[in-house]
Swiss-Prot record:
Keyword terms: ATP-binding, Decarboxylase, Gluconeogenesis, Glycosome, Lyase, Nucleotide-binding, Peroxisome
Subunit (UniProt): Homodimer.
GO biological process: gluconeogenesis
Name assigned to this protein: Phosphoenolpyruvate carboxykinase (ATP), glycosomal
Main location (coarse class): other
Enzyme Commission number, as recorded: 4.1.1.49
PROSITE patterns referenced in this protein's UniProt entry, alphabetically: PEPCK_ATP (PS00532)
Signal peptide: none
Any one GO cellular component localisation term in the record: glycosome
Subcellular location: Glycosome
MF-aspect GO terms: ATP binding; phosphoenolpyruvate carboxykinase (ATP) activity
Cross-referenced Pfam families: PEPCK_ATP (PF01293)
Length: 472
């Protein structure tokens, strides 16, 4: 018997279905949908595959990040997913857009058995108007999310019962063996990392905001370095928190929502994000008080990688059409695990390329399935290594060209640890200090001061200004 197909339900309808058919889904005290992704609470990078087709073979940087899957194996994986989806009682279909700049917008269609996943993608992508839905037509990319169904590890190219496969030729993503919703949004980011360079545009794993004078700041960084928190600035307008493209006209957000780490979320220092976790939002793997339904943002008993997803409309001052000009400031966020880096450093063009391609940060516990429980230094090219398709130097050259053309200033900001190692009890940089530094970047204070080379770090420099040092 074919499934009952629920096509493009509204968010309240998806919430109702989740409460009806998902045994562990419930509403929080403020109306967000609390859900579980079960066994996988983070991305599965070891199970990511890109299909080896003739149209992308020469472009892809094959290796540990981009592992090959043959077209024959992909066909078998796709068959498993489609057969599973076709035999469920309920099938949810979501049509959305990726990309606020309509010149480069993708039409995305998602098939999933979980209303939580459907609501997540409505939150994360751009929801069409009724008129746009009426003329949506065939999608540019299709996501078959059969995460409740396990993959067959005997299929050549697979090594486990999880598979997250992307086929650029057929324009499809297949998900098996993981119910972690983040795999869908990162799949779209990977697609853009291949499509945008074909038009000489830079895809960025970065957040962005814009000031009242139109000055744009882009924040590069891996999960947990502060992209979402720092871009949600009450004095500036949010463009987006994670995925952007820098074109010949400026910056646009790929997404229509935010996906924030929730562990340790403080309603006083991160009020914008806290207030966004209301009806229509998704609280993923968060622990609720059984009596009150309040989220305990400090409870790690399910996982460290607790998440909240919400539409941009939940953030006061966020741009509804998330497009802005060329960046005045580019900030690299690094979570230094050893406490040896300065709170902030200004970079020359050459230094910026070094740090961008190197992508030093620290592993944030819980972001990847099976990840370490303690912070350790890692190097993730372009501050987005897991999502790059081409070689890192390709994106580095793109960034250098754009920064030079538009005279962008570049900064390295340590949002990690100060005064010692993370695994020896050191405290993380206070958020108020980091925000004060960013304010000093935006008002020009850090740009109007003399700098000196930072001992032991020939590629960085720090301000000699007493005012700046008092902040840091």
């Amino acid at each position: 018997m074919p499934p009952t197909i629920h096509r493009n339900l509204l968010s309240p309808e998806l919430v109702q279905w989740a409460l009806k058919i998902e045994k562990d889904s419930r509403l929080t005290a403020r109306g967000a949908l609390a859900v579980m992704s079960y066994a996988k609470t983070g991305r599965s990078p070891l199970d990511k595959r890109i299909v080896d087709t003739d149209d992308v073979r020469e472009n892809v940087d094959w290796g540990k990040v981009n592992m090959k899957l043959s077209e024959e194996s992909f066909a078998r994986v796709r068959k498993i997913a489609k057969e599973f989806l076709d035999t469920r009682e309920h099938l949810f279909v979501v049509d959305c857009f990726a990309g606020h700049d309509e010149r480069y917008r993708l039409k995305v269609r998602v098939f999933t058995t979980r209303p939580y996943h459907a609501l997540f993608m409505r939150d994360m992508l751009i929801v069409p108007t009724p008129e746009e839905l009426a003329t949506f037509g065939e999608p540019d990319y299709v996501i078959y999310n059969a995460g409740e169904c396990k993959a067959d590890p005997s299929i050549p190219g697979l090594t486990s019962t999880t598979c997250v496969a992307l086929n650029f030729k057929t324009r499809e993503q297949v998900i098996l063996g993981t119910e972690y919703a983040g795999e869908m949004k990162k799949g779209i980011l990977t697609v853009m990392f291949e499509l945008m360079p074909q038009m000489n545009h830079l895809c960025m794993h970065a957040s962005a905001n814009v000031g009242k004078q139109g000055d744009v700041t882009v924040f590069f960084g891996l999960s947990g370095t502060g992209k979402t928190t720092l871009s949600a600035d009450p004095h500036r307008n949010l463009i987006g928190d994670d995925e952007h493209v820098w074109t010949d006209r400026g910056v646009f957000n790929i997404e229509g929502g935010c996906y924030a780490k929730a562990i340790g979320l403080n309603p006083k220092t991160e009020k914008d994000i806290y207030d966004a976790v209301r009806f229509g939002a998704v609280a993923e793997n968060c622990v609720l008080d059984k009596r009150t339904g309040e989220i305990d943002f400090y409870d790690e008993s399910i996982c460290k990688n607790t998440r909240v997803a919400y539409p941009l409309s939940h953030i006061e001052g966020a741009l509804s059409k998330a497009i802005a000009g060329h960046p005045k400031n580019v900030i690299f966020l690094t979570n230094d695990a050893f406490g040896v880096m300065p709170p902030v450093a200004r970079l020359t063009s050459a230094q910026a390329m070094f740090w961008f391609v190197m992508g030093y940060t620290a592993n944030v516990p819980g972001v990847e399935a099976g990840g370490t429980r303690t912070a350790r230094p890692i190097f993730s090219s372009c501050f987005g290594g897991p999502f790059l398709v081409r070689h890192a130097t390709f994106y580095g050259e793109q960034l250098a060209e754009k920064m030079q053309k538009h005279n962008s200033r570049v900064w390295l900001l340590n949002t990690g640890y100060a005064g010692g190692r993370a695994d020896r009890g050191a405290k993380r940089m206070p958020l108020r200090v980091t925000r004060a530094i960013i304010d000093a970047i935006h008002d020009g204070t850090l740009d109007r001061t003399e700098y000196e080379e930072y001992p032991g770090w020939a590629c960085t420099s720090r301000s000699t200004s007493p005012k700046c040092r008092s902040i840091c």
